[in-house]
Amino acid sequence: MALMLVLFFLAAVLPPSLLQDSSQENRLEKLSTTKMSVQEEIVSKHNQLRRMVSPSGSDLLKMEWNYDAQVNAQQWADKCTFSHSPIELRTTNLRCGENLFMSSYLASWSSAIQGWYNEYKDLTYDVGPKQPDSVVGHYTQVVWNSTFQVACGVAECPKNPLRYYYVCHYCPVGNYQGRLYTPYTAGEPCASCPDHCEDGLCTNSCGHEDKYTNCKYLKKMLSCEHELLKKGCKATCLCEGKIH
């Protein structure tokens, strides 16, 4: 079964200049993900960064907002539990990954997402972290090729020095152990989806997921009529020609 790398990101290690909003009037309510403008900022920032990957990616899906995941992300943020949620609390019709950001400053969503993405500096594509203690799992989830839905929530946790708690959920989940350091396929943008491309990102998402990492092999060995594949390899069996 596919395994997920469990990581969290401590925003307090970043310089205050990156985290602190320049506007003195900025309040937590302005970051509420119930606002359409905030949802658009989060989705747009993710898509912008997915277009910027190096080496360029041939099969990165364009991301969109997921309202069910928004509910889950906000509920977890409200708990002020500074650790990852169990997988059952971040599952919609798909299992979702999770990035956490904690800050003593009221950071913009774009700053939080950029902080995760900046881990790319510590990763050699298709090889691994440049240093043994480097954290790169937030970056790989942000740019995981088959993830096409995102939603987030934020809460204030006054009892903690890192009082602002940001949670984003990514569906379907990324960071499979089998290819953790290869979050997408290197190549010309949209080379894997020439007929389904929008500004360098693919639009042929699947809507299903594989629960096993060897579904392609299982399909050849057993065929999609087998009960094992019907339950655990829906993407492989139902999404031919789509990114999954």
UniProtKB/Swiss-Prot annotation:
Glycans are attached at N145. Residues 206-239 form the ShKT domain. Disulfide bonds join C190-C197, C193-C202, C206-C239, C215-C233, C224-C237. Residues 44-170 form the SCP domain. It is found in: Cytoplasmic vesicle, Secretory vesicle. Induction: By androgens. Mainly found in the cauda epididymis where it is synthesized by the principal cells and secreted into the lumen. Binds to the heads of spermatozoa. Also expressed in the submandibular gland. One of its GO terms (cellular component) is extracellular region. Residues 1-19 form the signal peptide. Its main location: cytoplasm. The keyword Glycoprotein applies. Keywords: Cytoplasmic vesicle, Disulfide bond, Glycoprotein, Signal. Belongs to the CRISP family. This protein is supposed to help spermatozoa undergo functional maturation while they move from the testis to the ductus deferens. PANTHER family: CYSTEINE-RICH SECRETORY PROTEIN-RELATED. This is Cysteine-rich secretory protein 1. It comes from Mus musculus (Mouse). The lineage of its organism: Eukaryota, Metazoa, Chordata, Craniata, Vertebrata. The gene is Crisp1.
